C-alpha cells in the first residue's frame, strides 16, 4: 500500500518552491486575463463560460432545448424590433442614427438597439468647439463623432444629380476631410466655381465663423441661396428620380439652414424670434425632421422664456408612448411637476406627514426620468464636471446626459427648490430597479451597450459615467487572493525551507486527521473480516 508519510519525507524544499511558484504564475496569468476581459466587456470570462457552456452541458438536452426555443423566439421578434427601430431612428449616417448592437431579455423579447442620434442642440465648431480647444488644448470632439457628422452631411447635402458638378463633388470630399483648414479651403473653392452652392456656406458658418454673429451672417446668405435653389428644384421635381432627389436635397439644406439660424437667434438672446422659427420648423414634414428633433430646441427656448404653459403643450404632444423618449422629454416633465411643489418641499416635514398628491406626482416624474437616464442627476447636482457635449448622443447614455445638463442646468436653477427635490428623491429610483439590466419599471431594461458607445463619442479626458456601477466578479477576487497567497508561500519556502517543510507536514497531518479518525470509527463499527465472512456465504 502507498505510504504517504514516506512520500512526503522524500520531498525537498525545492519541490515546494517550484510548486508554489508555478501555481502563483498560473494564477497571475489568469488574473491578468480576467481583469483585461472585465475591463473590455464588463463581465467575467470564467463566469460567462460556466453559464453559457458548462451549465448547459451539465443540464443536458433540457438546457439545449430551452436554448433553441429561446433563440427561435428572439430571432422571430428581432425582425419586428429592427423594423420598428429603423422607423424610429433610421439607418447609419443617412438617418442620423447608427445601430450598435441589440439585447435580448430573459422573456425572449428583443430590446431596441443602441442608436447614436444627432444632438439637437449641437454647438458650432468654429465659434464654440474651436474656442474651447484654443483655451484648453484639448480636442472636444472624437474622430468617431466627427465621422458620423460627415456621413450625415453627405446624406443630407448630396444626391445623384450632383454627378459631374465640380462644386458639389468638391463638397462631397470636403465633408470627409479631417483637416478643418482643408475643409474650409474646399468650401471657398466650391463657391468660386458656383456662388449658389448652399452646402459650402453651411460649412463656412459651422467651421470658419469665429463668433455666433458671423455664423448668423453667413447663414442668412446661405438662406437666400437655398430658397432660390429650392424653388428651382420644386418646379422640376416631377421630371424623374434624379430631379426628385435634387429637390429632397434642397429641402434638407433649407431646413438645416433655418434650424441653425434659429439656434443663432437663441444664442444671441432673440428668444421670441427663435421660438417662432422653431415652431414653424416643427410643422415641416420631410424625413430630416425626425432626425433633427427640433421640438427639443423649442422646449429649451420656451424654458429660457419661462413659458411653462407652452412647454406643457409641447410635452403633451411629444411625450407619447409611441414616440422615442429622450432625456429632454422626461426631465422637462419632471421639472414642470417639481415646479408646483419644490419651493415648499421639505424632506423633514414630508417624512412626518407623508407626501401630498402633487409631491407624489413630482417624485414619480423624477423617478421616471432617472430610470430613463440615470446619469443626468450627477451633472444637474454638479457632483460631476460638465464638458462640451458631443455632436452625437446615445439615448439613455452619458453623452445624452451631458448634452441635456449642459443646456438645461440653468433652467433647473431658475425653479426654486427643484434641485433640492431632485437631490432628496432621485436615488430612490434604484430601489425599484434592483436588476436594471434585466428588468425595467417604466422602460426597457437599461441597455448594456451604452458604455462602449459613449467611450467612442466622448473625449478621452472625460470619465465616462457607468450604470449600474460594475463590481469586480468573484472569480477575479478569488484569483487575486489565490495568486497572492501562493506567491507568499513561494517566497517563504525559498527563504525558510526547513520550517516551511515542517509546517507543510503539520498541515497535511491536520487535514488527514479527520479522515483517519473516520476510518477508525468505521473499522470499529464494521470489522474488517466481515467482508470475508459475507464472501463465504
Curated annotation (Swiss-Prot):
UniProt key word Membrane: yes
Presence of keyword Transmembrane helix: yes
Listed Low complexity bias regions: 67-84, 100-109
Record region (Disordered): 61-111
Residues annotated as signal peptide: none
Entry's family note: Belongs to the ST7 family.
UniProt-listed PANTHER family: PROTEIN ST7 HOMOLOG, SUPPRESSION OF TUMORIGENICITY 7
One of the Pfam families matching this protein, by short name: ST7
Major subcellular location class: membrane
Compositionally skewed regions (Gly residues) per UniProt: 85-99
Top-level division of the source organism's lineage: Eukaryota
Disulfide bond entries: none
Subcellular location: Membrane
Species the sequence originates in: Drosophila melanogaster (Fruit fly)
TM regions (residue ranges): 15-35, 472-492
GO cellular component, one term: membrane
InterPro entries: ST7
Protein name (Swiss-Prot/TrEMBL): Protein ST7 homolog
Keywords, comma-separated and alphabetical: Membrane, Transmembrane, Transmembrane helix
Recorded topology in the membrane: Multi-pass membrane protein
Amino acid at each position: 500500500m502507498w505510504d504517504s508519510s514516506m512520500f512526503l519525507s522524500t520531498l525537498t524544499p525545492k519541490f515546494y518552491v517550484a510548486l508554489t511558484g508555478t501555481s502563483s504564475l498560473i494564477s497571475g496569468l489568469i488574473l491578468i486575463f480576467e481583469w483585461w476581459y472585465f475591463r473590455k466587456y464588463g463581465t467575467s470570462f470564467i463566469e460567462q463560460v460556466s453559464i453559457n457552456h458548462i451549465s448547459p452541458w451539465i443540464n443536458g438536452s433540457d438546457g439545449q432545448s430551452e436554448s433553441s426555443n429561446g433563440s427561435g423566439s428572439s430571432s422571430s421578434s428581432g425582425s419586428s424590433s429592427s423594423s420598428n427601430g429603423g422607423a424610429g431612428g433610421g439607418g447609419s449616417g443617412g438617418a442620423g442614427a447608427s445601430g450598435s448592437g441589440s439585447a435580448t431579455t430573459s422573456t425572449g423579447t428583443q430590446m431596441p438597439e443602441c442608436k447614436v442620434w444627432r444632438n439637437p442642440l449641437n454647438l458650432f465648431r468654429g465659434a464654440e468647439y474651436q474656442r474651447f480647444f484654443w483655451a484648453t488644448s484639448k480636442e472636444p470632439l472624437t474622430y468617431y463623432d466627427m465621422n458620423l457628422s460627415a456621413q450625415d452631411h453627405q446624406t443630407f447635402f448630396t444626391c445623384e444629380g450632383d454627378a459631374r458638378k465640380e462644386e458639389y463633388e468638391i463638397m462631397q470630399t470636403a465633408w470627409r476631410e479631417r483637416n478643418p483648414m482643408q475643409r474650409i479651403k474646399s468650401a471657398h473653392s466650391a463657391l468660386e466655381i458656383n456662388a449658389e452652392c448652399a452646402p459650402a456656406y453651411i460649412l463656412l458658418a459651422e467651421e470658419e465663423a469665429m463668433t455666433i454673429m458671423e455664423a448668423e451672417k453667413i447663414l442668412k446668405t446661405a438662406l437666400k441661396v437655398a430658397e432660390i435653389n429650392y424653388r428651382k428644384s420644386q418646379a422640376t421635381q416631377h421630371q424623374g428620380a434624379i430631379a426628385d432627389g435634387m429637390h429632397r436635397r434642397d429641402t434638407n439644406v433649407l431646413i438645416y439652414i433655418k434650424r441653425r439660424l434659429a439656434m443663432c437667434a437663441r444664442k444671441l438672446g432673440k428668444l421670441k424670434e427663435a421660438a417662432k422659427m422653431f415652431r414653424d420648423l416643427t410643422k415641416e414634414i420631410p424625413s430630416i425632421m425626425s432626425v433633427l428633433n427640433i421640438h427639443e430646441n423649442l422646449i429649451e427656448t420656451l424654458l429660457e422664456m419661462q413659458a411653462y404653459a407652452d412647454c406643457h403643450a409641447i410635452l403633451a404632444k411629444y411625450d407619447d408612448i409611441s414616440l422615442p423618449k429622450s432625456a429632454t422629454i422626461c426631465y422637462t416633465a419632471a421639472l414642470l411637476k417639481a415646479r408646483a411643489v419644490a419651493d415648499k418641499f421639505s424632506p423633514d416635514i414630508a417624512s412626518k406627514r407623508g407626501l401630498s398628491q402633487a409631491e407624489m406626482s413630482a417624485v414619480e416624474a423624477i423617478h421616471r426620468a432617472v430610470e430613463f437616464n440615470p446619469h443626468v442627476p450627477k451633472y444637474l447636482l454638479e457632483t460631476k464636471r460638465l464638458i462640451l457635449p458631443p455632436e452625437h448622443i446615445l439615448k439613455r447614455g452619458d453623452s445624452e446626459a451631458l448634452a441635456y445638463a449642459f443646456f438645461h442646468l440653468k433652467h433647473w436653477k431658475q425653479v426654486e427648490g427643484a434641485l433640492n427635490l431632485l437631490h432628496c428623491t432621485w436615488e430612490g429610483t434604484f430601489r425599484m430597479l434592483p436588476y436594471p439590466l434585466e428588468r425595467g419599471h417604466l422602460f426597457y431594461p437599461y441597455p448594456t451597450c451604452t458604455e462602449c458607445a459613449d467611450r467612442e463619442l466622448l473625449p478621452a479626458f472625460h470619465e465616462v459615467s457607468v450604470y449600474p456601477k460594475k463590481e469586480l466578479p468573484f472569480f477575479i477576487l478569488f484569483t487575486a487572493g489565490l495568486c497572492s497567497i501562493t506567491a507568499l508561500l513561494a517566497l517563504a519556502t525559498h527563504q525558510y525551507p526547513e520550517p516551511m517543510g515542517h509546517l507543510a507536514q503539520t498541515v497535511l497531518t491536520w487535514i488527514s486527521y479527520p479522515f483517519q479518525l473516520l476510518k477508525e470509527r468505521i473499522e470499529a463499527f464494521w470489522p474488517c473480516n466481515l467482508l470475508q465472512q459475507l464472501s463465504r456465504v
